[in-house]
Structure formats: structure tokens, C-alpha cells
């Protein structure tokens, strides 16, 4: 067999594989649709989901997870975890989906941005990020749980955020947005500040100057980045509302969603920094000159105690922001 024949054979195999995968996805989507129709028949309060929504909710997360794995943004376990999170958020509400995608895609791009510089500053730097299932869980567990609760409360579909008409469902929507905006704000700050900031970070608890990479260290550039990251996620949610929600003219204004996203990004970054400064170990490895998160005999302590790792800090930050901010926002949210 010549090289040309071998290449043609590989193309045919790839094409057939894609057709088989697409056929399986369509079958899975139809099976989900049949189950939802059956549930709607026997349980009158259950609203059936259209087959197109099922198809979109299966196909798009699969494509994005595969693309993330191919570009090293996710490893095997991270791709599988992201697939589950993406499916649940997409089937629940397209505004949830666009917020998640905005967070994931922007964070992946920023992680790769100026990677050669970050490699010199971060002892745990991985090319592309290569997030595993633990990182996906710590950033996606809270939004996933809220999306499930939202479907139980309201059913799948988009709705305006209006506390005067649907208080519980609106609270859940803002809580989910807060969790994603918080994660985006923290990621934007940690990826942008080490590269662009010209001043040394200051520890959030004592305001002392600390080396770049210290957990709990903040800079003006980092805080501005976290505000922008959260705002970007909030903007994605808002624009999706404009496209998919029909009764916006008789609902409360939706523009505060953008500002809420920015506040969540900034507040989440501050909470993450405080937890990192107090409950996460930071030390200077005297051999390499890099900040490390594990205490050893050759490590000089900078701040924090070895209670939580970075993933646990992200999870706790997400939980706190998701609980506190929607409750505060409900008192200030404009009414119709």
C-alpha cells in the first residue's frame, strides 16, 4: 500500500468514525427526549424538553470537551468531567451554558497566553492548563448542583431574573452566575497579573510585599482583571437573555446581570485570596527561587498554613460567593 492509499484509508476511517459518533449522539438525544415525553405524560407538572434542545445539549459539550482535550486545556478525566458539567448546564438553561463557555474558553486562552513567562514563575505550570476532574469538580460542582435544583424548581428553559415574580429561581440563576463569575475572576487575575503587573504583590492579610505566585498576593492589575473576568461572564449571560427570553418587556430590567457578574468576579477573587493567604501554604524554594505550596526543609515559609490546597480554596470560594451575593443582590435588584 502506497503512502497516498494509506492517507486515503485513514481519512475514510476518520469519516466513518465521525458518522458513527454523530449517529450515537442523535440516538442518545432521542432517547432522552422519549424519556422526557414519557415523564411529562405521567407527571403533569414536568415540562417536556424538545428534541433539538436534547441534541444541542449533547453535541455541543462533546465537541467542546474533545476540543479542550485536543488543545491540552483538559486531560482525560477533565474532559469527561467537563462533559457532564456542560451537559447539565446546557439542558437547564442556555444562559448557564454561555456563561460556562465564556469562563472556560477565556480562561483556557489566558492560561496559554505568555506561557513561557509563567513557566519561569510557577513551579506547577502545565502547558495549556491540562485541568483534571478535580479542578473541573471544584469549579463546576456548585454550578452543576444549582442547575439541577433550577430544573427541579423551574424546569429546563430560560427565564428573566425577577425576584418579585420568581424569587427562588432568580436566586438560583444569580447564584450560579456568581459561582462562574467568581471562578473566572480568580483565573483571570492569576493568569494576567503575573505577566502585566509591574509592582510586587501584597499579601491581602498584612499588606506586606510577597514574591510573585504567593497564595493570597494581590495587585491592582489582578483585581482589575478579576473585575473584567466576572463582567465578561455576566455580559454573556445578559446577551443570552436578550436572545432567548420572550417576556423581557414585562419583567424586571436584566442589565444589572452585567454589573453583578463584575462584582462576583472581584469579590470571588478577594475571598480566594484571603483563604489562600490564611489556609494555603506558600513558601520560597531556596534552590529554584520559586514559590511552592508544599513545606519542605529547603522551603522558607511566606504565608498560610497547609490546611487547604488550591482546588479546595477554589471550591470554598465558589460556595461562599454563590451563597452570599445572590442574597445581597435580591434586596437591591430592580423591580418591574
Curated annotation (Swiss-Prot):
Protein name as it appears in the record: Transmembrane protein 19
UniProt organism field: Mus musculus (Mouse)
Protein family per UniProt: Belongs to the TMEM19 family.
Superkingdom of the source species: Eukaryota
Matches recorded under Pfam families: DUF92
A single GO cellular-component term on record: membrane
Membrane-topology descriptor: Multi-pass membrane protein
Transmembrane segments annotated in the record for this chain: 15-35, 49-69, 78-98, 218-238, 257-277, 313-333
Gene for this chain: Tmem19
Localization (cell): Membrane
InterPro entries registered for this protein in UniProt: DUF92_TMEM19
PANTHER family named among the record's database cross-references: TRANSMEMBRANE PROTEIN 19 (PTHR13353:SF5)
UniProt keyword list: Membrane, Transmembrane, Transmembrane helix
Amino acid at each position: 500500500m502506497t503512502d497516498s492509499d494509506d492517507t486515503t484509508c485513514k481519512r475514510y476511517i476518520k469519516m466513518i468514525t465521525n458518522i458513527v459518533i454523530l449517529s450515537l449522539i442523535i440516538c442518545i438525544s432521542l432517547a432522552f427526549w422519549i424519556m422526557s415525553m414519557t415523564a411529562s405524560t405521567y407527571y403533569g407538572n414536568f415540562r417536556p424538553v424538545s428534541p433539538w434542545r436534547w441534541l444541542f445539549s449533547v453535541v455541543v459539550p462533546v465537541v467542546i470537551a474533545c476540543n479542550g482535550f485536543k488543545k491540552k486545556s483538559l486531560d482525560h478525566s477533565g474532559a469527561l468531567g467537563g462533559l457532564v458539567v456542560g451537559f447539565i448546564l446546557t439542558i437547564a438553561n442556555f444562559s448557564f451554558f454561555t456563561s460556562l463557555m465564556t469562563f472556560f474558553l477565556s480562561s483556557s486562552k489566558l492560561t496559554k497566553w505568555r506561557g513561557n513567562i509563567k513557566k519561569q514563575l510557577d513551579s506547577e505550570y502545565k502547558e495549556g492548563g491540562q485541568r483534571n476532574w478535580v479542578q473541573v469538580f471544584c469549579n463546576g460542582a456548585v454550578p452543576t448542583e444549582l442547575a439541577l435544583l433550577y430544573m427541579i424548581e423551574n424546569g429546563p428553559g430560560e427565564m428573566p431574573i425577577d425576584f418579585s415574580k420568581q424569587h427562588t429561581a432568580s436566586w438560583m440563576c444569580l447564584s450560579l452566575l456568581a459561582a462562574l463569575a467568581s471562578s473566572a475572576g480568580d483565573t483571570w487575575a492569576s493568569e494576567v497579573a503575573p505577566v502585566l503587573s509591574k509592582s510586587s504583590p501584597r499579601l491581602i492579610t498584612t499588606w506586606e510585599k510577597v514574591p510573585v505566585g504567593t497564595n493570597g498576593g494581590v495587585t491592582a492589575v489582578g483585581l482589575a482583571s478579576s473585575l473584567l473576568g466576572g463582567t465578561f461572564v455576566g455580559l454573556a449571560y445578559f446577551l443570552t437573555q436578550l436572545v432567548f427570553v420572550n417576556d423581557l418587556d414585562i419583567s424586571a430590567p436584566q442589565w444589572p446581570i452585567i454589573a453583578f457578574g463584575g462584582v462576583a468576579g472581584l469579590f470571588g477573587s478577594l475571598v480566594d485570596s484571603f483563604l489562600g493567604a490564611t489556609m494555603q501554604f506558600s513558601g520560597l524554594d531556596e534552590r529554584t527561587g520559586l514559590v511552592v505550596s508544599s513545606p519542605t526543609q529547603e522551603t522558607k515559609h511566606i504565608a498560610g498554613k497547609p490546611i487547604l490546597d488550591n482546588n479546595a480554596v477554589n471550591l470554598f470560594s465558589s460556595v461562599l460567593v454563590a451563597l452570599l451575593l445572590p442574597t445581597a443582590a435580591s434586596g437591591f435588584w430592580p423591580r418591574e
